Amino acid sequence: MIYAGILAGGTGTRMGISNLPKQFLELGNRPILIHTIEKFVLEPSIEKIVVGVHGDWVSHAEDLVDKYLPLYKERIIITKGGADRNTSIKKIIEAIDAYRPLTPEDIVVTHDSVRPFITLRMIQDNIQLAQNHDAVDTVVEAVDTIVESTNGQFITDIPNRAHLYQGQTPQTFRCKDFMDLYGSLSDEEKEILTDACKIFVIKGKDVALAKGEYSNLKITTVTDLKIAKSMIEKD
């Protein structure tokens, strides 16, 4: 089975324009989270869309699904997320297992709730690649020169930009593989390894690159929100 896991566990309101976490802010005439879920509803191979939210916001998320996506709510599961990204993925996979016991071939397409401009092509590419590789990371080629500094004051290295990519989401992998690899980490490693695909990489797994889009914006600042609103208006 193919599942989607939407990471919507953040509670930050650092934009300072609302007391709502950013995934619940309005974009156009609907919350950002709803825009994101809608993209996954369009892919018929996805059995369930599991949304991991902070426990304080579970009821609110359920109300939004009832209001904006009543025809699709049977495909959507709202569950309590974890304290960080990887524990939220773990909680999402546990919710999938509760819905239907996991098989070794079950795949989850994980995605940031605040990337509402994901395309159907990106979702389908992730699913296709995950069937032949251990994991998939969605990326775009680095446009700006990236510099490295180990002390925050002086440049220690300028890597070759031709070899660099900017990570986005989705990140896709088999549910059981993630659970096994995450379970094998020490507590210290879990603190350091906040990116799911990095866990696969350090464990020597095959992580394929899926082509992202520069329009696959992650809305984390007021400027991001302004850009997203202009993109919605153009559509």
From Swiss-Prot:
Gene Ontology biological process: cell wall organization; isoprenoid biosynthetic process; poly(ribitol phosphate) teichoic acid biosynthetic process
Key words, A-Z: Cell wall biogenesis/degradation, Nucleotidyltransferase, Teichoic acid biosynthesis, Transferase
Catalytic activity annotation: D-ribitol 5-phosphate + CTP + H(+) = CDP-L-ribitol + diphosphate
PROSITE patterns registered for this protein in UniProt: ISPD
Name this protein carries in UniProt: Ribitol-5-phosphate cytidylyltransferase
Protein transport among keywords: no
E.C. number: 2.7.7.40
Upper lineage: Bacteria, Bacillati, Bacillota, Bacilli, Lactobacillales
Family named by the database record: Belongs to the IspD/TarI cytidylyltransferase family. TarI subfamily.
Functional description taken from the UniProt entry: Catalyzes the transfer of the cytidylyl group of CTP to D-ribitol 5-phosphate.
Record flagged with keyword Nucleotidyltransferase: yes
Record-listed CTP binding positions: L7, A8, G9, G10, G82, A83, D84, R85, N86, T87, S88, S113
Pathway the protein acts in: Cell wall biogenesis; poly(ribitol phosphate) teichoic acid biosynthesis
HAMAP family with a match to the protein in the record: TarI (MF_02068)
Source organism, top-level taxon: Bacteria
Gene Ontology MF: a single term: 2-C-methyl-D-erythritol 4-phosphate cytidylyltransferase activity
Marked site positions, Transition state stabilizer: R14, K22
Site feature (Positions ribitol 5-phosphate for the nucleophilic attack) residues: R161, K218
